[in-house]
A protein has these predicted regions:
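Glutamine-centric residue-chemistry signal
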Residues: 27, 106, 132-135, 306
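Canonical Radical SAM [4Fe-4S] cluster-binding loop centered on the CxxxCxxC motif
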Residues: 94-131
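Auxiliary Fe-S-binding modules of radical SAM enzymes
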Residues: 1-88, 240-248, 254-339
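Conserved alpha-helical substructure of the radical SAM core
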Residues: 120-149
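Conserved AdoMet/S-adenosylmethionine-binding subsite of the radical SAM
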Residues: 140-149, 154-316
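Helix-turn-helix/homeodomain-like alpha-helical modules used for DNA recognition
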Residues: 78-104
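Short linear Ser/Thr-Pro motifs
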Residues: 70, 104-105, 118, 188, ...
């Protein structure tokens, strides 16, 4: 067990069972959420307690296997080695409104999306809550930059690791921890409808970001296998339920793929499907993936598509490409390391 995956209430109960006074748990919790690498750094704890915790509950901080820093915009990409030798990626991005870290939720991915490097090799395992938290903490410590925003858009499908992701959100939002507001967190999903409904029940004030990437089943089936289980009509219906439960506008991710989903008819079909649903479209220049034959849309096609959506009443922005000189698209660094 890693103590960093426990809430303050759980940690208090655990240490009380071991005869420690109640205030000790808050001390330990605070140190853990500052990103200490050993209990020896917890200077306000008795030496005996530090030694015992070190023996019983090792902290297991991740190691930086590789780090790339963009010369263009300072975007920093990390390849972390976990305690079992598996590797995951996170990316620290600098914006005028603050620093955002994009984290992984799984080692590998089951979903098999055609345009994504993360899915090659399949799912190895799901991350523990502390392993997600560590990506935020140690990105912040290594860079010296305070993290104010988190996006769960790295390797893995967050809703496929539902319970651990919910615990991570609770921890990172904790006032005694990093205290990052839910409104500063975005969670991405390829469209696991039952889990979207579960998330809606929790009424969290985060941003749900749905990887849509197609206007209909015919196109989506060819690039996103998950669509065969949860067709686009079911997915949009779940998004409507989510909005009704949370009053939070849905963000739709849309990778612009030349000749696949970037036509005028595709834009018009999206407008019909989205009618009445408060939504924002994030148009994404497609990342190059070695094994994929898919090509990015031209700038002109992206601009035309954006205008069609906006003329139809949907807010659409073209995602700013960060770290293009370091190949900051997710999954690339891990794959190269595995080779």
């Amino acid at each position: 067990m890693n103590l960093k995956s426990l809430t303050l209430t759980e940690l208090t109960a655990l240490l009380k069972e071991q005869g420690e006074p109640g205030f000790r748990a808050k001390q330990v919790y605070t140190w853990l959420h500052k990103g200490v690498r050993s209990y020896g750094e917890m200077t306000n704890l008795p030496q005996g307690l530090r030694d015992r915790l070190e023996q019983q509950y090792p902290i297991c901080p991740p190691k930086v296997v590789r780090k790339q820093v963009s010369k263009l915009d300072g975007t920093t990409k990390y390849l972390w080695e976990l305690s079992d030798g598996n590797c995951v990626e996170s990316v620290l991005m600098r914006y005028h409104h603050g620093n955002t870290v994009c984290i992984s939720t799984e080692v590998g991915c089951l979903m098999g999306c055609a345009f994504c490097a993360s899915t090659h090799g399949g799912l190895v395992r799901r991350l523990e809550p502390f392993e997600m938290l560590d990506q935020v903490l140690f990105s912040q410590i290594d860079s010296g930059l305070p993290v104010s925003n988190i996006v769960l858009m790295g390797i893995g499908e967050p809703l496929d690791n539902f319970d651990h992701v919910m615990r991570f959100l609770e921890l990172v939002n904790s006032p005694e921890g990093m205290n990052i507001s839910m409104r500063h967190i975005s969670l991405s999903t390829c469209g696991l409808v039952p889990k979207i409904d579960l998330l809606a029940e929790k009424k969290l004030q985060l941003t749900l970001s749905v990887s849509l990437h197609a206007p209909n089943d015919a196109v989506r089936n060819t690039i996103m296998p998950v669509n065969k289980a949860y067709p686009i009509e079911e997915l949009i219906a779940a998004c409507r339920r989510y909005y009704e439960a949370t009053s939070r506008r849905i963000s739709f991710e849309y990778a612009m793929i030349q000749g696949v989903n970037d036509t005028e008819e595709a834009a018009k079909e999206l407008l019909r499907r989205m009618k009445g649903l408060p939504a924002h479209f994030n148009l994404i220049p497609l990342n190059y993936v070695e094994e994929s034959p898919l090509k990015p849309s031209t700038r002109q096609a992206v601009a035309r598509f954006q205008k069609l959506l906006e003329d139809g009443g949907i807010t659409a922005t073209v995602r700013r490409t960060l770290g293009s000189d370091i190949d900051a698209s997710c999954g690339q660094l891990r794959r190269k390391h595995m080779k």
